[in-house]
Amino acid sequence: MQRSIIIGRPTITFDTIDSTNDYAISLVSNSNPNEGTVIWAQYQSKGRGQIGSNWSADPGVSLLMSVILKPRFLMAYQQFTLNILASLAVRSALASYDIDTHIKWPNDIYIDRKKICGILIQNVLQGKGIKNAILGIGLNVNQDHFDLPLPNPTSMRMVSGT
C-alpha cells in the first residue's frame, strides 16, 4: 500500500534564520520529524544554493522554505528524480500565474535569461537508498531590486509589473 504525505504538516516558521536547509538537516539528524514538515522564514541570513553559492533576498519578499522528505522508494542513483519533480512543480506553479519559465538543470528556474528561483536538495543516504531529502526552494516573489553582483535575477513582481 502506498502512503501519502501532506506537505506543510507541520510547518515551522521563523522571522529570521540562518538557513532553512541547515535547520531541516539538524532536525533530521537529531530527531524524527514528520515527512512533509516545512520550514519557512521571512529572511535567511545565510541562504545558499548549489556548490556553496549564496542565496540573497530582502526580508519578507520571497518564498524561502525547506521541505523534509523521506523518499525511501528511491535508490541513491535516482536522486536526480527529486530535482526533476521539484523543478517541474515550481514551473507548474508559476505557470498558474501566467509566468512562462524554463528550467536550467539541475536546479534553477529562469524567465528568459533571468533567474527567478533556485532549488537546493540535500540528501541523507542510507546504504543504497535515500533516507531523507531536504528540498530547499528560494523563489523571488515581491522583490523589486537586487544587490549586485547577482547574475540576472528577477521576481514575480518584476515580471508581472504589479
Language model region names:
Residues M1-S96:
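N-terminal lobe of the biotin/lipoate ligase/transferase fold
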Residues I6, R72-Y77, T81-T101, I111-T162:
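Long, positively charged amphipathic alpha-helical accessory segments at protein N-termini or as interdomain linkers
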